[in-house]
Protein backbone atom coordinates (compact mmCIF):
# COMPACT_ATOMS: atom_id res chain seq x y z
CA UNK A 1 0.00 0.00 0.00
CA UNK A 2 1.53 3.33 -0.98
CA UNK A 3 1.77 6.38 1.26
CA UNK A 4 -0.83 8.45 -0.60
CA UNK A 5 -3.48 5.74 -0.28
CA UNK A 6 -2.66 5.28 3.41
CA UNK A 7 -3.02 9.02 4.10
CA UNK A 8 -6.33 9.13 2.24
CA UNK A 9 -7.63 6.12 4.20
CA UNK A 10 -6.45 7.66 7.49
CA UNK A 11 -8.23 10.92 6.67
CA UNK A 12 -11.49 9.16 5.80
CA UNK A 13 -11.20 7.01 8.94
CA UNK A 14 -10.74 10.12 11.08
CA UNK A 15 -13.75 11.83 9.53
CA UNK A 16 -15.86 8.71 10.08
CA UNK A 17 -14.71 8.50 13.69
CA UNK A 18 -15.59 12.15 14.39
CA UNK A 19 -19.01 11.83 12.78
CA UNK A 20 -19.72 8.64 14.73
CA UNK A 21 -18.61 10.29 17.96
CA UNK A 22 -20.87 13.28 17.26
CA UNK A 23 -23.87 11.03 16.66
CA UNK A 24 -23.12 9.05 19.83
CA UNK A 25 -22.86 12.21 21.95
CA UNK A 26 -26.09 13.63 20.52
CA UNK A 27 -27.95 10.38 21.16
CA UNK A 28 -26.58 10.14 24.70
CA UNK A 29 -27.75 13.70 25.36
CA UNK A 30 -31.18 12.91 23.98
CA UNK A 31 -31.51 9.76 26.08
CA UNK A 32 -30.05 11.05 29.38
CA UNK A 33 -31.41 14.62 29.36
CA UNK A 34 -34.69 14.42 27.41
CA UNK A 35 -36.12 10.90 27.53
CA UNK A 36 -34.96 9.64 30.96
CA UNK A 37 -33.59 12.61 32.94
CA UNK A 38 -34.67 11.74 36.49
CA UNK A 39 -32.14 9.36 38.02
CA UNK A 40 -29.09 10.64 36.14
CA UNK A 41 -29.46 14.25 37.30
CA UNK A 42 -29.66 13.09 40.91
CA UNK A 43 -26.77 10.64 40.56
CA UNK A 44 -24.52 13.38 39.11
CA UNK A 45 -25.36 15.67 42.03
CA UNK A 46 -27.45 18.19 40.12
CA UNK A 47 -30.42 18.75 42.41
CA UNK A 48 -33.09 20.96 40.87
UniProtKB/Swiss-Prot annotation:
This is Fimbrial assembly protein, serogroup F1. It comes from the Bacteria. Keywords: Fimbrium biogenesis. It comes from Dichelobacter nodosus.
Amino acid sequence: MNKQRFLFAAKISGIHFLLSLTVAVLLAGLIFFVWYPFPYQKIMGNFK
